[in-house]
Design a protein with these regions (language model features):
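Short, surface-exposed loop/turn segments at beta-strand-coil junctions that are enriched for proline
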Residues: 729-733
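Aromatic sugar-binding surface patches on proteins
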Residues: 718-726
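Soluble catalytic regions of membrane-associated enzymes that act on cell-envelope
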Residues: 192-541, 549, 556-559
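Solvent-exposed serine/threonine-rich low-complexity stretches and specific carbohydrate-binding patches
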Residues: 706-717, 757-758
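Phosphate/adenylate-binding glycine loop and adjacent helical scaffold
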Residues: 541-659
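A short beta-turn/strand-edge loop motif at beta-sheet boundaries
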Residues: 684-691
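Transmembrane and membrane-interface helices of multi-pass
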Residues: 2-204
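Short beta-strand elements
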Residues: 750-763
Length: 763
């Protein structure tokens, strides 16, 4: 016992050396956010204190062999190397977060060694600040360690040291890993305050000791196939298209990293996709569209198959992928020629294996490019080269009808491509076009390579469509463009922004363009396309399906009739959307137009969403174990014709919705120093509405509230409406701001209807 207490006292005597090293690293990290230091300092210190208290026993165990050594040189060598490694890990995790804009958790469990090497190569840019800081920090730590080890009469008495260690063991189980904090609309700052080593350790421990979910609930009464249900997807697209004698060609373009915060109308950071914006004005454009995955691993299964995730993503099951139906396999079986093109390796995320399982006729990755073509970076070929490669192939492979999938890669770290310097110069030109104030441009300068890659990909798309219009069959083609996820390297306001991507459906067959504010997800694309082709062209679809989606919602106003999971990384399944609420890492948020979220205390909705999410996780885990998704009989031959009487868009009970009160046709106008808003409020219910107050809220580009104004309390009869004018005096500097028109409760001010949000205006 005496030997143990001696080593324990020695540990606490030397511990200030490690704490000092960690503190210096934290100060270096916070120093790169000097303008926000006041908001960051206290939460960061609390998180670091939590990390120290909770993980103290683990540090002690790692140090114990060295602490027990009698030879001073050997003891110092063991402790010095061990603690240097801890500091190096913390520094590397900080550097990763600075480069990737995201925290590193248990992600690496979801990738092969070959994929990890490719990921690391993509993040090869050296963070010289952190590299230099780590060298200095380790030197300081070793210097203090040597001095502390010389102390012959340590200040720690054995009972105090034992008590401190015992309390830290208890703290590990009782205290939270990180402080819960309101990010104030700046998720990018919130993750700065997180202790990176504690987050990494917690995520990996949680992954390794995760409990098996509860018993799954069957969807059809067949416990072996709980995802199977009757195919009831309605044809929401059909009324919007002119039909032709032959089925249309389909081209799906998956743009790496394309997010709504920098693309499309009202983009929070300004739109850097002028061509896509122009195309959106000629298309069906979903403003509140969701990618169910936060990384590329899930986009092909989600978009092309409306498939569940399994443990690490559906395609990660490789040759053990359960038998399943998809857009590709169903169309392939009915005469479509199917093709897939990407500029990167087909091995990454098992993309090639997934497309092979669909029976895809042509699968082309980086290995299929002409060797004379210049590679963009470690990931593969730049988007212009990818589109040229596909166009050249298509010119020699005419087919009617065709399904073509093109997946880009340029908008991915390290964001390098031919002609990069020219596009960096164009970033400044774009800032001028967007009227971004001079004092707001630091962010854009710091991330010029990212914004340059966005402009480059937008130009590559412009080039592709200019050439595609010359191709045979263009007039009978439907083009679908979306992002695989929102790139994380640019600052995000909140967790949902990672999943917020545009959906553009463009076609010469389209009767007229529309902007759609209702929510849908990539899970809804395949069911909708198959319902459209079945209803309009007589193609057959399976009578039973395993789709997670129920079809694209065409409602012009904001609403969500869907419920679905979100998986940010291969090992992170913590988010779920049901109606107008999002359950994220155990916390509930309400979702508003523009995909803005606010914390919600709706306990009934929280209970329902938690139950739905738990049920999904249970059957998702069962899928991973059994490798069974649908019976063979469902896949043998598509047989279901379209019957509109059996179709419905909403198939799940929602945790919460915003009822029957709606705001529409809101318009903003600034006259002198006054903001004037006109809007229509309507009751779409079969009964009279409760009392409500029209509420106007003005925010800046970061979502910070700047003021509000109220109208008169009102009630509406069934199916009645009223025009409302709201006004507010403005005491704001010149710039771009946003107005939200909300159906609010007379007493609490909380939303009780479908508002209209994020309406831009210029002061």
């Amino acid at each position: 016992m005496k030997a143990f207490t001696t080593t324990l006292v020695r540990f606490f005597t030397c511990l200030p050396a490690l704490v000092l090293g960690m503190a210096i690293l934290r100060l270096v990290e916070l120093g790169t956010h000097a303008s926000d230091l006041k908001a960051l300092l206290i939460p960061a210190l609390i998180n670091d204190l939590l990390a120290l208290v909770r993980y103290l026993p683990f540090v002690f165990l790692l140090s114990l062999p060295g602490l027990a050594m009698r030879n001073r040189l050997a003891r110092l060598a063991w402790i010095g190397v061990t603690w240097s490694m801890l500091l190096a890990v913390q520094g590397a995790l900080i550097a990763y977060q600075r480069a990737a804009g995201a925290l590193l958790g248990a992600d690496l469990f979801g990738y092969s060694w070959k994929e990890i090497q490719l990921i690391l190569a993509g993040h090869a840019n050296t963070d010289f600040l952190m590299a230099a800081s780590m060298a200095i920090v380790i030197a300081v730590m070793l210097s203090v360690l040597v001095r502390k080890d010389r102390i012959e009469k340590p200040g720690w008495k054995p009972p105090y040291a034992i008590a401190a260690l015992a309390l830290s063991v208890v703290a590990f189980f009782l205290l939270p890993n990180q402080m819960e904090s309101d990010d104030g609309g700046r998720q990018d700052l919130a993750i700065v305050t997180v202790n990176k080593a504690a987050f990494f350790a917690h995520a990996n421990l949680e992954y390794l000791v995760r409990w098996a979910p509860s018993k799954p609930a069957a969807g059809t009464g067949d416990a072996a196939y709980p995802f199977v249900h009757a195919e009831t997807t309605p044809d929401t697209l059909g009324p919007l298209f002119n039909t032709q004698p032959t089925p249309p060609n389909l081209v799906l373009i998956i743009v790496e990293g394309l997010g709504r915060s920098f693309s499309g109308p009202g983009a929070r950071q300004g739109s850097f996709t002028p061509f896509l914006d122009e195309l959106a004005g000629q298309s069906l454009y979903w403003e509140n569209f969701v990618a169910p995955q936060g990384r590329t691993f899930g986009v092909l299964p989600s978009l092309l198959g409306s498939l569940p995730f399994g443990e690490h993503g559906f395609s990660s099951m490789g040759k053990n992928m359960p038998a399943h139906a998809s857009l590709v396999s169903i169309l392939h079986s009915q005469g479509y020629r199917t093709r897939y093109f990407t500029g990167t390796s087909l091995e990454f995320d098992n993309q090639g294996e997934f497309m092979k399982r669909q029976g895809t006729d042509v699968i082309s990755g980086s290995a299929q490019f002409d060797p004379s073509v210049q590679r963009g970076n470690e990931w593969g070929y730049a988007d212009r080269e990818l589109f040229d490669h596909q166009l050249k192939f298509a010119g020699n492979d005419s087919c009617q009808p065709c399904l073509t999938v093109i997946q880009t890669v340029t908008m991915h770290d390290p964001f390098t491509f031919p002609g990069q310097e020219e596009y960096k110069a164009r970033v400044t030109q774009r800032l001028d076009q967007l009227n971004i104030a001079a004092d707001k441009r630091a962010l854009y300068r710091d991330d010029a390579r990212i914004f340059a890659s966005i402009l480059y990909t937008d130009d590559a798309l412009r080039h592709y469509f200019a050439e595609a219009r010359k191709q045979p069959g263009h007039d009978n083609t439907i083009y679908i463009i979306t992002g695989d996820h929102r790139l994380p390297e640019l600052p995000m306001s909140h967790r949902l922004e990672r999943y917020h991507v545009p959906l553009i459906v463009y076609s010469p067959l389209l009767k007229e363009p529309q902007r759609i504010r209702s929510m849908s997800s990539q899970f809804d694309v395949t069911p909708s396309l198959l319902a459209f082709l079945s209803h309009q062209y007589g193609l057959k679809t399976p009578a039973q399906a395993s789709w997670l989606g129920s079809g694209l919602d065409m409602e012009p106003g904001f609403r969500n009739v869907h419920a679905f999971p979100l998986k940010q990384t291969k090992t992170d399944l913590h988010d779920y959307i049901s109606g107008n609420v999002m359950l994220s890492q155990g916390r509930l948020y309400s979702i508003a137009d523009g995909m803005e979220i606010d914390p919600s205390d709706n306990q009934d909705a929280r209970k329902k969403a938690s139950a739905q999410f738990s049920a999904f996780k249970a059957i998702n885990a069962a899928l991973e174990r059994s490798k069974k998704l649908v019976p063979a009989s469902v896949l043998e031959q598509p047989s279901l014709g379209y019957d509109g009487n059996q179709r419905k868009l909403q198939t799940a009970a929602l945790a919460a919705d915003l009822g029957n009160l709606w705001v529409s046709k809101a318009k903003a106008e600034v006259v002198e120093d006054e903001l004037r808003i006109s809007a229509q409020f309507a009751n779409r219910g079969d009964a009279g509405s409760p009392a409500f107050v029209p509420l106007l809220v003005v925010t800046d580009a970061n979502g910070r509230e700047l003021g509000e104004s109220y109208g008169k309390a009102t009630k509406l009869a069934s199916n009645a409406g009223v025009d409302v004018d709201l006004r507010m005096k403005l005491k704001l500097p010149a710039g771009t701001y946003f107005a939200s028109v909300i159906v609010s409760h007379p007493d609490t001010g909380k939303p009780i209807g479908q508002g209209q949000y994020h309406i831009p205006f210029t002061r």
